């Protein structure tokens, strides 16, 4: 259960960086479930006692099940600059995952992946899009591996 509280990691006049809550959408969809965009807008509205609508630009996303760090733009100018920076590949994305079982060292996984729209899951399919994943084991404990 999410209580609607957000963890603000950084904030200035242009951006706000928050911890994305696992299993919470980044932006609203047809489920009407809680979403980070709404939570952060609410936070800004309360903190700064803002009347009316709060502008908040969404410049990147994380999948619903994933927790992590997400950056929102507080101005349209910041949104434009951040979007340009992302499209020019000036951002480096680093993902950490905890796996069941143990792996050792480093590796590369390559396959063809295709999204099943009905189940909203990705499967290996020879007609899918080529995908490559490089991983490095950072640690193991209790039959779990951090990569």
Regions found by a protein language model. Name each.
Residues 1-147:
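RNA pseudouridine synthases
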């Amino acid at each position: 259960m999410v209580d609607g509280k957000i963890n603000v990691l950084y904030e200035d006049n242009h951006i706000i960086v928050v911890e994305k809550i696992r299993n919470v959408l980044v932006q609203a969809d047809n489920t009407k479930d809680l979403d980070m965009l709404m939570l952060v807008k609410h936070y800004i509205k309360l903190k700064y006692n803002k009347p009316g609508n709060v502008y908040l630009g969404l410049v990147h996303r994380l999948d619903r099940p994933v927790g992590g760090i997400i950056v929102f733009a507080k101005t349209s100018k910041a949104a434009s600059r951040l979007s340009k920076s992302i499209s020019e590949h000036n951002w480096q994305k680093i993902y950490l995952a905890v796996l069941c079982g143990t792996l050792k060292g480093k590796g590369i996984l390559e396959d063809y992946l295709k999204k099943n729209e009905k189940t909203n899951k990705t499967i290996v399919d020879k007609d899918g899009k080529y995908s490559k994943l490089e991983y490095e084991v950072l640690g193991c404990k209790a039959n779990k591996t951090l990569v």
